[in-house]
Amino acid sequence: MTRYFLAVHTRPTPGRETEYHRWYDDFHLDEVLQVPDFVTAERHVLVQSEGAQLLGPGSHLAVFTITSDDIDATMTAFRHAQKSMARPACLDADSVALSWWRPLGSRTASSSPLVPDSA
């Protein structure tokens, strides 16, 4: 099985932030996790700091982990499931942007040759 990620940028409709968070946490994450091969869901919010730039159309990011031997079939299943997923008014529809990712490599500080050994 190969691991993939679906990144979804969104933002709440102004003035409906509480409703947006409730919908996402109490309903939508579980709705997406019902799609075959989707195994984890994690939400993030943009950290506002000096010089921070918005890299996507939304201030919020959901990252879904997928494990699949056939990502094309998984993507098709997701698109089919999307047709019945709720799009509540608390979600700014213009902010929704999806992108699919496949890891190219990974490293931890403990395995990096540039990080000094603490021993």
Residue ranges of predicted features:
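Macromolecular interaction modules
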Residues: M1-A119
